[in-house]
Structure formats: C-alpha cells, structure tokens
Amino acid sequence: YDEKFRKIDTIVQKQQKIIEKLMVYKQSIITEIVTKGLNPNVEIYDSEIQGMDNIPKHWENRKMLSILSMRVVDGPHESPELFDEGIPYISANAIVNGRIDFTKMRGYISEKYCDVCDQRYTPRKKDILMIKLGATTGQIAMVETDRRFNIWVPLAAIRCNDEADARFVYYALQSRYFIRQMELSWTYGTQQTLGVKTIERLRIILPPKNEQREIAVFLDKKCASIDTAIDKKQEIVEKLINYKKSLIYEVVTGKKEVI
C-alpha cells in the first residue's frame, strides 16, 4: 500500500503542477490582450499604472467606479440561519476558476431572509462577484444564471454600466496589472481584506466599447479550451484522491469501500 500511495501522490503532484502552468498561461494571455488589444500596429502611450507597460493611445485609464451602474456592495455581515433547502447562499468557497460552483454553497436561506438580502443586493446575470476577504481575496466569477441566490459578506458585487462590456471587465479583473493593484491595496487584520470603496478606486484600462466586445469574444474562445484542459486535470486529481481514500479505508478496516 505504501508504494501505491507514493505513486498516487506523485501523479497528483504532477497533475497539479500542470494545472498551475495552465492557469499561469491563461492569465498571461488575458493580461496581454486586455492591455495591448488585438491590433499589434496600434499607437501606444504610458499607462501610468504601476507594474504595467504602454497601452493603446485611444484607450482610457479609468477608475472602476466610473464604469459601474451601482456602488460596489458586499453581502450581509451577519450569519443567517441555514437550512437543507431553500434559496442558495454562497460565499468565497463557491468561486472556483472564474465560475460559481453552487455545489460549494454555504447552505440554503429562507425566502423571507432572501427578501431582506435583496434589499441590499439582488444578483443579476453579468454581475461580477469578487472575493474581498480571506486567502483567495481578488478571485472573481460572473453570474451566468437566472437562478435566485444571494451572497454572504466575503463577496462583493460589481455591476457594469453601458460604457463597459461586462465580459471584458471580467477578463480585465483577472489580469496581472489589476491583481497587482489589489495586492497593493488590501489591508491585513486577522486576514487580508479588500474594502468595497477600495475596489471602486482601482484603475482599469478601457478600450472603446466595440473593441471591448471583440476582445471578450476572442478571450471567451481562447480561455474555453484552456479551462477544458484544467477541468480534465482537476477531474483526474479528484479521482486519484478518492481512490487513495478508498485504499486507506481498506487498510484501516480490511474491507473494500464502495465509491
């Protein structure tokens, strides 16, 4: 069994390294395109953003607040009663690889409590949810469902106005230059924190709307193939971890576990 465990651990580590490389590759593509655009021959100028090179001359350096249709808002600061069924209530754990994973929700809340949450914030398609508290601060996901749900305090909601294409902003918020801004802006207490007003003050490089759409379409296609590869590798890792657990069960109990 020791030899089997070693082999499983080795394969898992190799797969995880591949996943890390794919994620770095994905971020490098996103950063290149949201800061340079799709036209290599365009005139450029100094972006004046720390850690960022020149950008196309006709693009703008804007505050996040200027491209939002509402102020950045986080979820309720109290812990609600959770149930086995009802309205999904999500927190930071549900933000996985740029998407919302409802299987990792915090639990269910009552319709009555969700009505209260809705007075503060009601999720809509194309909203961007950002983790603002804890080890994964800065990670984001886009709302892509009409399903009713709500968010807890570690998440902040960002809603774009008509000047900004939400998909473009979704990618820009994953770029190295934006993540670097967040890292320089968050505060530390018991854990790293990014305030909602701080998010509003961060800078974003904004092309004209038609270019934003073109970039978003390009990155949707490019990132979809990378995400598929990442998902396949993660599936392998999960299967191997479950297999190892079943072997441990067998060692401890002398019985095969049905998985």
What are these model-predicted stretches?
Residues Y1-N41, I205-I259:
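Amphipathic alpha-helical coiled-coil/heptad-repeat segments
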Residues V34, L38, I95, I100, ...:
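Hydrophobic pocket-lining residues within nucleotide cofactor-binding pockets
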Residues E43-S47, P76-E85, K104-M105, L184-W186:
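Short coil/turn segments at secondary-structure boundaries
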Residues Y45-D46, Y89-N93, M105-C114:
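Short, structured beta-strand/loop micro-motifs enriched in basic residues and often containing a Trp
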Residues S47-D74, R201, I205-K209, R213:
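Non-catalytic DNA-recognition/assembly elements of restriction-modification systems
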Residues E60-D101, D115-D118, T137:
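Low-complexity, Lys/Gly-biased intrinsically disordered segments
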Residues S91-A92, E111-Q174:
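A short beta-sheet element
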Residues K132-L133, R148-A156, R167, T187-R213:
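A short glycine-rich beta-alpha junction/loop motif
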